[in-house]
Amino acid sequence: MQSTDYTDLDSQLEYWNTEGPQKAFAHPLNLRRMTHWLSLDSVIIDFGCGYGRSLGELAEAGYDNLIGLDFSPAMIEAARERFPEITFEQIESVKIPLPDESVDGALLFSVLTCVPTDDGQRAIVKELHRVLRRGGLLYISDLWLQSDERNLTRYARDEQKYGTYGVFDLPEGVTVRHHDPKWIETLTSDFEMVALDELEVVTMNGNPARAFQWFGLSLKREQ
């Protein structure tokens, strides 16, 4: 059962089951920053792990307490085949099956772009904040709003439909989102940002794009 804040538009499960395993995801993993905040025995989760590429890189670097979570059964099956030594779990809601403050680090790679709504994104980040220990690392890699004509046309075309500038439909039948820096700042208000890198990536459809990698430490509010 899905969270009331996380809709079918946010999960788009049929698309990821059929098209996801064939897509190439190219956001690089910054191991230098990871090892600065997370020792090799850290418990690390990858929310929206896809076919496990990022966790595979972490395992190769020596991390061994790794958990991948994804809604898509096809993606989880592909991840288990590629990396049998890593734990991968299919989830059916945003709720992460782990206790409060039980995780040292969390990856959110190319996930927000696949979750078009504010509420859907908030639900994910809130749940990651719950499971991260105080001072635990959240590492987001995603796409900024772009400035090229192709993307500007798509933003303008679908802004009224979705009510958010930067949300648009792709021809293959999936809805995605590019992000305003102010929204990312609002979304991550329960974290202390400790680094922000900007870079060029190639999207899952082979197009160049401006991306960001955001690193923040979990702040726990007093009860």
Model-derived regions: residue spans:
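Class I (Rossmann-like) S-adenosyl-L-methionine-dependent methyltransferase catalytic domain
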Residues: M1-S42, F47-K95, Y139-Q223
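Short amphipathic alpha-helical segment that frequently serves as the phosphate-/nucleotide-binding helix
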Residues: P28-L31, Q121-V125
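GHKL-family ATP-binding catalytic core of two-component histidine kinases
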Residues: P97-P99
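A conserved beta-strand element that flanks and buttresses the S-adenosyl-L-methionine
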Residues: L107
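Short catalytic micro-motifs in class I SAM-dependent methyltransferases
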Residues: S110-C114
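Conserved catalytic-core motifs of eukaryotic protein kinase domains, centered on the activation segment
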Residues: T117-D119, N151
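A short glycine-rich, Lys/Arg-flanked "PGG" loop and its adjoining helix->strand segment in the class I
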Residues: R122-R134
